[in-house]
C-alpha cells in the first residue's frame, strides 16, 4: 500500500512539475540596447544611457547600456498580439524614478506611475524623490527597492534631484494578472497635476519582459494520469507478491 501511495505521489509531483515548468512562456522581452522594438510606441520617450543606474538589479538583469527614458505626462504603449492560450499574464521591468518626482503632495499635486492592461488599471502609485518629508504611496515589497533617494545622474546632485530604482519584476502585483486574450496592450505613464518637464523629473524602464501562464494541453494530463494508473497497478501487484 505504501508503495502504491508513493507511486501516486510521484505522479502527482510529475503533474505539478510539468505544470510549473510550462507555466510561464515569455512572449516579449527587450533590454533596450538595440533598436526599439516595433511593439513599443514610445511617444516622446527616448533611448538614453543609464548613467549611474548601471549595475543596479539582479544578476543578468541589471540596469546597463540604455534604458527607455520618458518625461512625465508622456504615455509609453506596448502592444502584443498572437499570444498563446493562457490564463494569466506577468509583467517585469526595472523602474527608474529620476529627479524631483513629488509623490502624493499638495504642491506640486502628485506624480503617479500609472500602468494599464487593455484599458484597465493594474498599478497606480505615487513616487517621491525630492524631499524626505514627501509622501510616497508605493510601499515596495522586500527585494524590490534597488536604490532610494540617491544621486544616480541626470539632474543631480542636489536635494531635489535624487533618484530611486526598483525591480518591479519582483513585486507580486505584476504576477498572475488575470488575462486570456490573444492580444494585450500595456500603457505606462507618470500622471498627475504635478507633472513637470524632463529636466526637472522623469522616469525610465529597463529589461522589460512579458510572459503568460500557458494552459497545458489536455493530452498532457491524460498521459500523466494514464502513467499514474499504470504505476499504481504495478505497485499494487508488487505489494501482493
Region locations from a protein language model:
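Extracellular carbohydrate-recognition regions
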Residues: 24-48, 122-127
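Terminal, low-complexity interaction segments
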Residues: 30-36, 138-213
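Surface-exposed, low-complexity/disordered Ser/Thr/Gly/Pro/Asn-rich loops and linkers
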Residues: 48-79, 199-200
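Short beta-strands within extracellular/lumenal beta-sheet-rich domains
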Residues: 70-86, 111, 168-174
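Extended extracellular/luminal ectodomain segments enriched in beta-structured repeat modules
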Residues: 83-92, 181-183
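Extended, low-complexity, turn-rich repeat/linker tracts enriched in Gly/Pro/Ser/Thr and Asp/Glu
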Residues: 97-108, 194-197
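Short coil-to-beta strand junction motifs in C2/discoidin
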Residues: 104-113, 202-203
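A short, hydrophobic C-terminal helix/tail in secreted or cell-surface proteins
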Residues: 217-236
Amino acid at each position: 500500500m505504501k508503495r502504491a501511495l508513493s507511486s501516486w505521489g510521484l505522479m502527482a509531483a510529475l503533474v505539478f512539475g510539468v505544470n510549473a515548468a510550462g507555466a510561464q512562456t515569455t512572449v516579449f522581452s527587450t533590454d533596450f540596447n538595440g533598436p526599439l522594438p516595433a511593439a513599443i510606441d514610445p511617444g516622446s520617450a527616448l533611448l538614453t544611457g543609464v548613467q549611474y543606474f548601471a549595475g543596479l538589479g539582479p544578476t543578468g538583469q541589471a540596469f546597463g547600456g540604455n534604458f527607455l527614458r520618458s518625461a512625465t505626462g508622456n504615455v509609453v504603449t506596448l502592444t502584443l498580439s498572437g499570444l498563446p492560450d493562457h490564463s494569466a499574464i506577468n509583467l517585469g521591468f526595472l523602474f527608474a524614478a529620476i529627479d524631483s518626482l513629488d509623490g502624493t503632495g499638495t504642491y506640486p499635486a502628485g506624480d503617479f506611475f500609472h500602468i494599464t492592461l487593455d484599458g484597465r488599471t493594474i498599478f497606480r502609485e505615487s513616487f517621491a524623490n525630492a524631499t524626505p518629508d514627501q509622501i510616497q504611496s508605493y510601499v515596495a515589497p522586500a527585494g524590490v527597492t534597488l536604490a532610494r533617494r540617491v544621486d544616480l545622474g541626470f539632474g543631480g546632485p542636489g536635494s531635489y534631484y535624487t533618484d530611486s530604482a526598483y525591480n518591479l519584476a519582483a513585486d507580486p502585483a505584476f504576477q498572475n494578472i488575470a488575462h486570456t486574450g490573444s492580444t494585450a496592450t500595456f500603457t505606462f505613464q507618470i500622471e498627475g497635476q504635478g507633472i513637470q518637464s524632463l529636466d526637472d523629473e522623469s522616469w525610465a524602464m529597463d529589461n522589460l519582459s512579458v510572459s503568460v501562464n500557458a494552459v497545458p494541453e489536455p493530452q498532457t494530463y491524460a498521459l500523466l494520469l494514464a502513467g499514474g494508473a499504470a504505476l499504481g497497478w504495478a505497485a499494487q501487484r508488487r505489494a501482493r507478491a
